Structure formats: structure tokens, C-alpha cells
Amino acid sequence: MTRDRPTLLARVLILPIRGYQRWISPLFPPVCRFYPSCSSYAVEALRVHGAGRGLWLTIRRLGKCHPFHPGGLDPVPPRRNESGTEISDARPGSDGEASPGAPGL
């Protein structure tokens, strides 16, 4: 679900997040109430959606990070095209299931 390569601005925004993940986050116990963690969510959102929408999704996610929110599974939404339908990078039959008409499966 990621773009072939994040935009330049998205890569610039990812750098400080990676720095936080590498040097600051290990100093503290894991306390994130979400999966994936907020920093991992931010990196994935920027890669999948680019700088504009990825930053917006990250800000929304950080806004939910408080003691009164239950947390839990909160994946990055899939990328959509101009008509609003999901863009899938998967090819038919690549999910491990046999495709219709596959002999012997």
C-alpha cells in the first residue's frame, strides 16, 4: 500500500520521526495505547499518502492520544484515487488464496 517512493517533502518529514524512534523512544518504556505506535503510524501515513494527507492523518492520530481514548488497532487508511475508490497494490490471487479455476487447489 505504499507509494513507489515517498515525495521529497514526505521524506524530509520522516527524518525527525526516525530520529525520535532511534534515539529518544528507546529511553522510555513502551506506553503507546495504539497499534501501530504513533511514530510508526506517522511514517506509514507519510509514505502511503504523501506529505499533505500524511501529515493531516498524523495530527489526527496524535489528537486521539490521550488517557480518555481506548486506543487499540488504528491502521493507516488505504490510499484512494480521485474517484474515491481504494487503490490496491496487490494482484489478484496474491493473498495466498487459490484463484478461481486454479487446477488442483
From Swiss-Prot:
Q: How does it sit in the membrane?
A: Peripheral membrane protein
Cellular compartment(s)? Cell membrane
> What are the alphabetically sorted keywords of the record?
Cell membrane, Membrane
Positions with biased composition (Basic and acidic residues): 77-94
Q: Which domain of life is it from?
A: Bacteria
Annotated spans, Disordered: 68-105
Which coarse location class describes where this protein primarily resides? membrane
Key word Cell membrane present in the record? yes
Q: Does the keyword Cell membrane apply?
A: yes
Q: Which GO terms describe its cellular component?
A: plasma membrane
Stored InterPro entries: Membr_insert_effic_factor_YidD
Function as written in the Swiss-Prot or TrEMBL entry: Could be involved in insertion of integral membrane proteins into the membrane.
| HAMAP family hit by this protein | UPF0161_YidD (MF_00386)
Family per record: Belongs to the UPF0161 family.
What this protein is called in its record is Putative membrane protein insertion efficiency factor
Species assigned in the record: Thermobifida fusca (strain YX)
Which lineage do the record's taxonomy fields give for this organism? Bacteria, Bacillati, Actinomycetota, Actinomycetes, Streptosporangiales
